[in-house]
């Protein structure tokens, strides 16, 4: 095989594996955005969010929760992917993901990171707890409403007549 044939073969192999990777990521997006997955994850977080505290110390109780989450969510996602891609191999995909992590949308990668990175998992729970307790990110102080009318003397009733 000469150099040109090798390059062509490598390109077609690369393109096929890239297309396969892109297809899996597309399916992952569909699965993660699906109401069934959202409900599964929300129910799990509702069950355990009060266990998590925003401290440097990680409680021993976090470990079984983390393991249960991995088992539940990873199993669900793998089953969904197997329905869409017969013969799908999660371990092989995870390896490929490490090489393509810059190409994956942030929210997808962050969610996948919760399977392997305990701190990402804990942060997800802390964010959820803050949201449940009304301590979520408040952007209202940064919002300013400005009238688009040139004259501020136009009354509300006159303004309504214009629309």
UniProtKB/Swiss-Prot annotation:
It holds the Pfam family ARL2_Bind_BART. One of its GO terms (biological process) is maintenance of protein location in nucleus. It is found in: Cytoplasm; Mitochondrion intermembrane space; Cytoplasm, Cytoskeleton, Microtubule organizing center, Centrosome; Nucleus. The keyword rRNA processing does not apply. Keywords: Cell projection, Cilium, Cytoplasm, Cytoskeleton, Mitochondrion, Nucleus. GO terms for molecular function: transcription coactivator activity. InterPro entries: ARL2BP, BART_dom, BART_sf. Signal peptide: none annotated. Its main location: cytoplasm. Together with ARL2, plays a role in the nuclear translocation, retention and transcriptional activity of STAT3. May play a role as an effector of ARL2. Belongs to the ARL2BP family. This is ADP-ribosylation factor-like protein 2-binding protein. It comes from Macaca fascicularis.
